[in-house]
Amino acid sequence: MAEPRMPRPAISPTRDKSHSPYRESPSRRLRDVETGYNPPQNPPYPPQRNGTEPYPPSPSSRTADWEPIMSNPNPMSQSDLGRKKSLIRPERNRIDRDHPNYYYRKHAANMEVLPSTTGNDPVVEDLAEHRTVSSGSTQQDTSIEEEVVGNPQKSRMPGKLEPVGKKKAPRKLVRKDTRNLTEEEKRRQKELDKIKPPSIWNIYCAVVTFWAPDCLLQCFGMPARAQRRAWKEKVGLISIILLIAAFVGFLTFGFTQAVCAAPGLRLKINHVDRSYMIFHGGAYNLDGSMHPAARGIPLDANVLYDLPHKYGGQDGSFMFQKVNGACKGLITLAEGSDVPTNSDGDLAWYFPCTAFNQDGSSEVNLTSPYYLGYACHTTAKARNTFYSLKKAGDVYFTWDDIKNKSRNLAVYSGSVVDLDLLKWFNKSQVAWPQQFDDLRENGRVRGMDLTHVLQSATDKQVGRCLTQIAKVGSIDTESVGCIASKVVLYVSLVFILAIVAAKFFLALAFQWFLARRFAAAKTSQTSDPKKRAKQIEDWTDDIYKPAPKITDPASTVTGSDGRTSKRGSMFLPQTSRFTSPYAVDRRSSRPPPTTMTSQSSNAKLLPGGNPYKSGFNSSQNTLDLHSRMSVGASRSSLLLSGQETRYSAVMDNLDPNGPVGFIHENVVPQPPPEWQPFGYPLAHVICLVTAYSEGEDGIRTTLDSIATTDYPNSHKAILVVCDGMIKGKGEAQSTPDIVLGMMGDFVIAPEDVQAFSYVAVSSGAKRHNMAKVYAGFYDYGPKSRIDPTKQQRVPMMVVVKCGTPDEATKSKPGNRGKRDSQIILMSFLQKVMFDERMTELEYEMFNGLWKVTGMSPDFYEMVLMVDADTKVFPDSLTHMVSAMVKDPEIMGLCGETKIANKNASWVSRIQVFEYFISHHLSKSFESVFGGVTCLPGCFCMYRIKSPKGGQNYWVPILANPDIVEHYSENVVDTLHKKNLLLLGEDRYLSTLMLKTFPKRKQVFVPQAVCKTTVPDEFKVLLSQRRRWINSTVHNLMELVLVRDLCGTFCFSMQFVVFIELIGTLVLPAAISFTFYLIILSIVKKPVPVIPLVLLALILGLPAILIVLTAHRWSYILWMGIYLLSLPIWNFVLPAYAFWKFDDFSWGETRKTAGEKTKKAGLEYEGEFDSSKITMKRWGDFERGKLDQRSSVCGILVETNLCHLFRTASSGERKCLEPATSYASTERLRFYAWVRTLP
């Protein structure tokens, strides 16, 4: 239970980093990234020691080989210890309550460490002996030891260094004294709370719901203020979802129409029919026109059909010439010209006023039929009539038309100019610049764009002039808006395809290459992956179907793994008579992974027979009679570390009922640390099962599966937390009675167990809760489905939340929710690791675990969380621990959950493929980056603490104060918090872990499998998915703000989380757009090919994933059923969940007897009275126990200690000599050993 300490920057002699078999943490550098700690460059004190006593070694070294820890094996200069070329300045970070390490720093500030000038590990100060402390031990402060043994020397020895940190009182229990607020201070605080300005979110919700005042909502059944606030926040969220959906719909369908409106009628050159006439590049429909009377034209004649010359389909631009515009000054009047002009030099026309063919085939005709200027329409009336005509459309040319060698065409600013029209100039009438002739006769200009050629001012005027007098059409181009819409379309297409393809291929790479690294080298199941997969599929057909028996001897833990054998092993000897029989895989020069047990290699085992010396015990540590007697005879801990422990001064003086003084006679002994049946060092695991209203069959199935896993029982313990005195619907017994009926060999008889107080996760008076702790062993029952030869003895502890006496008569006494059940364990682990004050309940949990396991709870490194209706495959726990041990950066993982009632109804059938794809696609993809965003609470594992830096240094993970503090939040006053903490607490824990430790990993281990029953009624599925979808949305909102996740910008987990959040919010809109697109492609032409291809890829890739990863073709059928049910998954369920944002109840999921569905999280009753809860450190509880007894086990309380001897005649123990002087640790251990003698 040692506090976590900083890692040493120098290389530890017991742990060579250069030969590590597993990936080293990138954060292993001088600065501890997770705590933000930086060693001081110039420490205020030089290192000093009292006396000449050397420093002790690490737990894995021998006593004779002790070397000073402060000695540096690799001397480094002072300059080498500083940070080099780093842009990170963690010391400049503002450490407020939002900082991920805020609470950890507060707890670490109470650590007493000495400064170091060498950069080595800080030394924990001990006033009795200068010893380092393993976090695997439980060290009690020396001041407590002095009080127990009566040592009057409590003053600090001269020359002792003051610990780094704050000035502390003489007592060792250092806490900030809580100061009672006066009435005036409370009043001021209330006033400050009242004048707190509203947030932007609250203002937005008030604006959106202005039409629904509080008085109106009260009339509609919302009397509570919390209900009205939740409803307004719900409307605010729905409005944002609608805005996002509208934006997505606009990008999908409206953006193209907005920026690229459908162009008007466009007529291709040479395809303009006889009902049109062309003027200046535009086509005019003159089919119903009537011309006034003129020479050669009768009244109301149609110029297209009624005249001798048929003008239909011809270009009449010369009849309405654009003169005196850009061409003024360029085209001038020729000498002797008959063209009318005025004083300003304006000309009446430039060309003969006649029509020509649109294909440019007309010959030049400079004559006029009646008079000069005939058909030039120079009068204002004629011009106004022409300008009033509506253009039917533009005449366009393609580039192929422009490059046609039969014509002399060029392009200027998008307009097509026919340079051959310049031949129609009459030299006798007008004069034009020579540049016109040069352009017309230059063959290199033909078919070119002259826009960038004519760049000077004069050239630009020439270009504009040509456009006015010789324009015959426009180039076939798209508008900027249309180009932009296509760019957006293709960029979106590439972007979506990249995400889908990356997700698919990375998930496939994880399944094929990366996942196998997590698995154990050998387990109790078959070593053939295909055969094992088939066994799992058969096993998941029924929830009560037992696991397959071991049929492959080569795959058992006692067999050899052929894949690990080497060809050269048959020629050269690999062992000798001096080789340890427990050593496993020592052929590699690389050190094994670090666990608490591997660091305690000098631990002393129980006296008597050791079942592990004879090889693997097929019954998984079930001892014979002789071994039981040996265990029962021992009255000390099974694992006594060679180091002095934090509790050594107290635990050696306990009474027979204390944690060390009494160990259950059926306790499972601890094997040697070298014993590695699965190819990796074993780690201790707590299997947490949270029970609420489950029935006897469900709980029995879960506990049977955990108890019969092939992981050694010496390294696992079952902890069941019953959430209140609850009776499930249709059950004859309450859940606590059902669970207690599955226990045996109680440490204390159930009727004698007392209820103890603790601080619950709730508000008001419900923060005080009481619970009972039952410790014993799992009982399979007389009608067990488990073969008696397979029944193993597993330590088990049950915590029953029974509630305070005030709520005994109320419904569901003691019920505080699943999060409170998890916090009971998490808070307990934090108190154990930091040696902090604990409640009476936590103290009893400490003693209960010690008595049924024979070891300190600080040895546990991992927590397996399983729901009480889930059944675990036998080797799943082995694979999960294997991943944790092999990669210390993994802080959480989950296995695959399979459905056991696939064919119960259509509701269960549509969920089969959804479960499959969520694991093998989503979680596999996220595991590549180590950022699985959701570890299902029904089957997951978290790391309690992780090795960090040098030997014996650990940092809290699940037991981290920041995790415990945030997860135990009891002020749940906003819609966001309620969806996080009341509906999706399991997912929020995963989110919290990623927020606090963004550089660590959460992965999916496909080898670990469990099965469960899913809802087979639609109303239950609707209620379950409402909770899941709403919690997913709010958890993704939390994660999207974490900037330290793996990757950068679009190639980061933060971006992936953002895409998932948007995708979740627009699910109803997306499925609606999909069906609209399919219908549109059927009834309208042309078919939108690109969106349909994209849709086919998104829906079809999972089928390929099934072929490549699944082991049954039946999943193709399940996929078809899932696709048919897409409207339910993507529309009905999300839309219902969004509308129920303000519903915080569990609905129809797990109802109890007589319960009515109601909204939760809205009412708080009474005030919390903290005086009802006693909190002390473990040593204070033990001293109090000693003070309550006059004489226990030969220890006199009046003298605190006495020398023990036994008489040879009667064998009874007798106190002969009180101890009045300081007793050494060895002497205390000797007395403890004497007390264990029969």
Curated annotation (Swiss-Prot):
GO biological process terms on file: chitin biosynthetic process
Compartments reported by the entry: Cell membrane
Short name of one Pfam family: Chitin_synth_2
Record carries keyword DNA-binding: no
Thermal behavior of activity: Optimum temperature is from 30 to 45 degrees Celsius.
Disruption of the gene: reported phenotype: Leads to reduced chitin content, abnormal yeast clumpiness and budding kinetics, and increased melanin secretion. Does not affect virulence in an acute mouse model. Also leads to increased expression of the other chitin synthase genes for compensation.
Protein name: Chitin synthase 4
Assigned keywords, A-Z: Cell membrane, Glycoprotein, Glycosyltransferase, Membrane, Transferase, Transmembrane, Transmembrane helix, Zymogen
Gene: CHS4
pH effect summary: Optimum pH is 7.5.
Polar residues: bias regions: 71-80, 133-142, 553-562
Top-level taxonomic group: Eukaryota
